[in-house]
Regions:
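N-lobe entry segment of adenylate-forming
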Residues: 1-34, 38-53, 74, 555-569
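Conserved AMP-binding/adenylation subdomain of ANL enzymes
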Residues: 179-196, 203-248, 263-268
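AMP-binding/adenylate-forming catalytic core of the ANL superfamily
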Residues: 243, 250, 389, 394-395, ...
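Conserved ATP-binding/catalytic segment of the ANL
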Residues: 356-360, 364-365, 372-380, 384-444, ...
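AMP-binding/adenylate-forming catalytic domain of the ANL superfamily
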Residues: 468, 475-480, 508-533, 547-564
Length: 569
């Protein structure tokens, strides 16, 4: 069997332990599960149906709600040798519809598939797409005698990044890079065959698809799934599912752990058993040291061990994994001088900014480079993170110039083939620290400020804004000025001016920032990606064009002159 082919591994598992549970999905109707034998047969049957309609290598758009049907159809695509293109189902969210239309326009799929009850809705959402697409429901056909024989360098699927909808970028994941990254993930977490996973993450995002579905199947393990909507409504259900199925591995962004701390009641906590959870993986967004402490303290009574918490770093462009905390060791938290950090240096300090280390890179080569010159920087210096090695994707679908710029990094000494991540970070005693995104960096009066630091400081600034998101960026007027867009609960906001002054006071006291421009908006006004990350550049553009619906704005005369002339409010 081809060792660089995921389906060959799945076929072997189906032959060796056909009756072992592979995947389970829980919703309000209960639990449905598939064994390896059932899952493999479903993939071959859907693969047979696909093979009658499209040629190997064709793209197929997959827009499914959470559930087992997506799993079967995605694996059916691999079995038929067609290129799956996972995307969110375009429900009531205009963001999801824009996202799907952008993905469809870029990928030019031959088919668009969804669940039978949703065919009409998806067809309507795709109206006007280029090329014109009508949705279908995949069916079970005559099973393929065996999965399609693939070349290691051929495409397995397109993973679209969570950027702006006008810049949909499909990361080309080959069969080689998929299998390579699954090996890297298993090594990072020190996982054995049969490992048990649990997840609520969406399947159209890399962490949900690769880490929480394909990795357990690659290992002959089991994964228990639920929908993101159910998690957001009832965070306790995720932890309950982990305990009920004895999951060892589950991953989520930082906000999910804070949500559990805030929303899980004492009675729910009493009923939880988290003693099996050995890998509490935190990643996909900036990791807060305080979140790690709060989560470990809150759920210790449920059997959670503090050394089970891990911090990880990865991205779609590496198929997922880059680095992670060593198993059995809590993440390294290092306190650095914030003023030195503004000068791109990590200087240890007794008090200051707490940085969470994302482990030591193992299978991949990681260096810190000057983003302008490509010169490798020494330990403790902040620069752009460059990566080279197994799992790095083949580039962006039909974007040769972006592929060259991003995947063709060459150092000042002539070493080539590096992925330029666009992330800022540093290595210290071998540990990788992430400090922010280059494009999000706020530069004011020569100071480099990281927006997520400022946003985090505003979490508890006022009852009307408690645990509500904020978005910090700078605008040129012509000198850079800071803008804070803060979501608020209007019913708890008696005095907008008072909140503005509290925001300015916090930023002045903690960061030495002068009078910031403040825009107070309703919940949901700050734009996010489909994975929940704040879209700072899009929110900035909306602010600049007057496209945000504001409760109240407190802006400097220069910002008003540049960005509010001709706009209401």
């Amino acid at each position: 069997m081809n060792s660089m082919d995921f389906m060959s591994t799945l076929s072997r598992h189906a032959g060796e332990f056909a009756d072992r549970r592979a995947v389970l999905f829980r919703d309000r109707r209960g639990e449905q599960a598939l064994t390896y034998g059932e899952l493999h047969l479903a993939a071959l049957r859907i693969g047979g149906w696909l093979a009658e309609r499209v040629e190997p290598g064709a793209r197929v758009l997959l827009c499914y709600p959470s559930g087992l049907e997506f799993v079967e159809v995605f694996l059916g695509c691999l079995a038929a040798g067609v290129v799956a293109v996972p995307a969110p189902f375009p429900d009531a969210s205009s963001l999801h519809r824009e996202r799907v239309l952008a993905v469809a326009a870029d990928a030019e799929p031959a088919l668009a598939l969804t669940s039978a009850p949703l065919v009409e809705a998806l067809t309507a959402a795709l109206a006007g797409s280029e090329p014109g697409l009508e949705a279908q429901a995949a069916e079970y056909g005559d099973p393929l005698p065996r999965p399609h024989v693939t070349e290691p360098g051929s495409l397995a699927f397109l993973q679209y990044t969570s950027g702006s909808t006008s810049d949909a970028k499909g990361v080309m994941v080959t069969h080689r890079s998929l299998v390579d990254t699954l090996r890297v993930g298993a090594e990072l977490l020190d996982l054995r065959e049969g490992a048990r996973f649990c997840s609520w993450l969406p399947m159209h995002h890399d962490m949900g698809l690769v880490a929480m579905l394909l990795l357990p199947l690659h290992l002959g393990g089991a994964t228990a799934l639920m929908s993101p909507t159910d998690f957001l409504r009832h965070p306790w259900l995720w932890l309950d599912l982990i305990g009920r199925h004895g999951a060892e591995v589950s991953a989520a962004p930082n906000f999910a752990y804070d949500l559990c701390v805030r929303r899980v009641t004492d009675q729910q906590l009493h009923d939880l058993d988290l003693s099996s959870w050995k890998h509490v993986c935190n990643g996909a967004e900036p990791i807060d040291a305080g979140t790690l402490t709060r989560f470990a303290d809150r759920f210790a009574a449920a059997g959670l061990k503090p050394e089970s918490l891990t911090a990880g770093y990865g991205m779609a462009e590496t198929t997922l994994f880059i680095s992670g905390t060593a198993p059995g060791h809590a993440p390294v938290v290092t306190t650095v001088d914030p003023w030195a950090l503004e000068r791109d240096t990590l200087d240890l300090a007794a008090t200051g900014r707490a940085l969470v280390g994302c482990g030591r890179p193992r299978a991949l080569q990681v260096l810190i480079a000057d983003p302008d010159t490509g010169a490798e920087l020494p330990e403790g210096r902040v620069g752009e993170i460059w990566v080279r090695g197994p799992g790095v994707a083949a580039g962006y679908w039909r974007k040769p110039e972006e592929t060259r710029r991003t995947f063709g990094g060459t150092t000042a000494t002539g070493e080539g083939g590096f992925l330029r991540t666009g992330d800022l970070g540093a290595l210290l005693e071998g540990e990788l620290y992430i400090t922010g995104r280059i494009k999000d960096l706020v530069i004011v009066n020569g100071r480099n400020l990281y927006p997520h630091d400022l946003e985090r400081a505003l979490t508890w600034v006022h009852a009307a804004a408690e645990n509500m998101p904020s978005c910090v960026f700078s605008v040129a007027v012509p000198r850079e000025e800071i803008v804070v867009v803060q979501e608020v609960r209007s019913r708890a906001l008696a005095s907008p001016g008072e909140l503005v002054e509290e925001i300015r006071s916090v930023l002045s006291r903690k960061f030495g920032v002068g009078a910031a421009n403040v825009c107070l908006v309703r919940p949901g006004e700050i734009r996010r990606t489909t994975s929940g990350k704040i879209r700072r550049q899009v929110t900035r553009q909306l602010f600049a064009s007057g496209g945000l619906t504001a409760h109240h704005e407190a802006l400097s005369p220069t910002v008003i002159a540049h960005y509010r002339k001709g706009h209401d409010g």
